[in-house]
């Protein structure tokens, strides 16, 4: 599997489909934002070959050269997005899902009408600048994984039931059904209304909050790409502790001024210690002291029906490889698993089998990285849950499936 080296670059091009006029170009190098721009001749050639295929009723989706993978995607016959990656072995699935998230981010900020009925290109360029911070986070080495899995990044708080009860009461007091508590862009707790949000906004909204500079409070207009792409809503955020924010998705009411400190103190002051215990959960995802095998270097757990996931590389963080490498390896392993071994989500036959045979034998695959590294990656699926583990070299290969199955059973009550 490919690994991002220091020289790997990702370029993202956005063009008006009808005219080919570039709306923006964003780049990253080695996982960090970069000012490197592609020459206009290259941009024109990439768009030209795509348009040439369309004129011949040929859909050009992707292409590979010796050192670059290219993916094209047209949205609503109005916006063309092109992704180029020099990461060794990068998959089309990864780039295609990134393009879907980028377009979702554009709709989230400016609305679908502005993108499908472009009246003034220069004005649209200016409006899209507000989405750059969010878009750039998809190009870099994020600690989140929802952009790839299309599942909401979650954490498990130590006192989840108390947190959920307080959140529901606060939502009722403020008169909105869509409320969540976020830490570092991950959902700690949310109301039923928030969980019913469709994709991609269910992933994009926490990701947006995590990408914005810290503020005590915000009143941010957003469109919902799935639920309300042409009529804006208000995203209100309130910082309880640094890195821990309340989010409310609402209409004209309530005004931000009504969410005064007294209201917050009444609901959240009694939970001050549980709230503080949530702060380390950003990178860790699991409560402190949760029993995990010492050989586990990282894990990704997905609930394929609820569209939620847990992602952490914190276990045994004093061992090699680095947390950044672990995240990249698990992301790459997920793309391999999703495209080769397991379908993205259960089909009707599998769901029927879940009902008829509740006690299933997990489906599994594993990969040993080498030479010289020896890190082991294993995936096991049981019903609606898929678990990916990264394990240290000393883990015996014959014990991978058993370790993964026991870990999945231990994590199942959490997600």
Swiss-Prot record:
What keywords sit in the KW lines?
Cell projection, Cilium biogenesis/degradation, Cytoplasm, Cytoskeleton, Developmental protein, Protein transport, Transport
Key word Cytoplasm present? yes
Q: Which CDD domains match?
A: Fuzzy
A single GO molecular function, which one? phosphatidylinositol binding
| GO biological process terms, semicolon-separated | anterior/posterior pattern specification; aorta development; cardiac septum development; cilium assembly; coronary vasculature development; embryonic body morphogenesis; embryonic digit morphogenesis; embryonic neurocranium morphogenesis
One Pfam assignment: Fuz_longin_1
Subcellular location as annotated: Cytoplasm; Cytoplasm, Cytoskeleton; Cytoplasm, Cytoskeleton, Cilium basal body
Q: List GO terms (cellular component aspect).
A: cell projection; cytoplasm; cytoskeleton
**Could you give the subunit structure recorded for this chain?**
Component of the CPLANE (ciliogenesis and planar polarity effectors) complex, composed of INTU, FUZ and WDPCP. Interacts with CPLANE1 and CPLANE2.
State what this protein does: Probable planar cell polarity effector involved in cilium biogenesis. Proposed to function as core component of the CPLANE (ciliogenesis and planar polarity effectors) complex involved in the recruitment of peripheral IFT-A proteins to basal bodies. May regulate protein and membrane transport to the cilium. May regulate the morphogenesis of hair follicles which depends on functional primary cilia. Binds phosphatidylinositol 3-phosphate with highest affinity, followed by phosphatidylinositol 4-phosphate and phosphatidylinositol 5-phosphate.
> Which family does the UniProt entry place this protein in?
Belongs to the fuzzy family.
Q: In its UniProt entry, what is this protein called?
A: Protein fuzzy homolog
Where does this protein come from, organism-wise? Rattus norvegicus (Rat)
Query: From which lineage does this chain's organism come?
Result: Eukaryota, Metazoa, Chordata, Craniata, Vertebrata
């Amino acid at each position: 599997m490919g690994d991002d080296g220091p020289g790997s670059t990702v370029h993202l091009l956005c063009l008006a489909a009808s005219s080919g006029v570039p709306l923006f170009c964003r780049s990253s190098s080695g996982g960090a934002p970069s000012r490197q721009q592609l020459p206009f001749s290259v941009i024109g050639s990439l768009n030209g070959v795509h348009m040439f295929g369309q004129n011949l009723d040929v859909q050009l989706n992707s292409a590979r050269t010796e050192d670059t993978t290219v993916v094209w995607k047209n949205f609503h016959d109005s916006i063309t997005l092109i992704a180029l990656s020099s990461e060794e072995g990068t998959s089309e699935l990864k780039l295609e899902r990134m393009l879907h998230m980028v377009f979702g981010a554009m709709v989230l900020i400016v609305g679908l009408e502005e993108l499908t009925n472009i009246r003034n290109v220069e004005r649209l360029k200016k409006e899209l600048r507000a989405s750059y911070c969010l878009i750039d986070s998809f190009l870099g080495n994020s600690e989140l994984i929802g952009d790839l899995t299309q599942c909401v990044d979650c954490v498990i708080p130590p006192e989840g039931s108390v947190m959920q009860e307080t959140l529901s009461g606060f939502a009722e007091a403020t008169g909105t059904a869509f409320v969540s508590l976020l830490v570092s862009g991950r959902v700690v707790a949310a109301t039923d209304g928030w969980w019913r949000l469709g994709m991609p906004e269910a992933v994009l909204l926490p990701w947006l909050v995590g990408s914005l500079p810290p503020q005590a409070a915000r009143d941010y207009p957003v469109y919902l790409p799935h639920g309300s792409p042409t009529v804006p809503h208000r995203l209100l955020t309130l910082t309880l502790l640094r890195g821990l924010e309340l989010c409310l998705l609402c209409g004209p009411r309530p005004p931000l001024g009504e969410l005064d400190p007294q209201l917050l103190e009444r609901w959240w002051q009694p939970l001050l210690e549980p709230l503080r215990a949530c702060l380390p959960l950003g990178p860790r995802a699991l409560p402190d002291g949760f029993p995990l095998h010492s050989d586990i270097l990282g894990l990704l757990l997905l609930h394929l029906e609820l569209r939620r996931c847990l992602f952490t590389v914190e276990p045994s963080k004093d061992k090699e490889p680095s947390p950044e490498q672990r995240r990249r390896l698990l992301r790459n392993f997920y793309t391999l698993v999703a495209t080769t071994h397991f379908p993205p989500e259960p089909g009707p036959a599998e769901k029927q089998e879940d009902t008829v045979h509740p006690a299933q034998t997990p489906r599994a695959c594993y990969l040993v990285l080498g030479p010289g590294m020896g890190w082991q990656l294993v995936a096991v699926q049981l019903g609606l849950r898929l678990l990916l583990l990264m394990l240290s070299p000393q883990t015996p290969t014959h014990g991978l499936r058993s370790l993964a199955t026991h870990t999945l059973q231990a994590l199942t009550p959490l997600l």
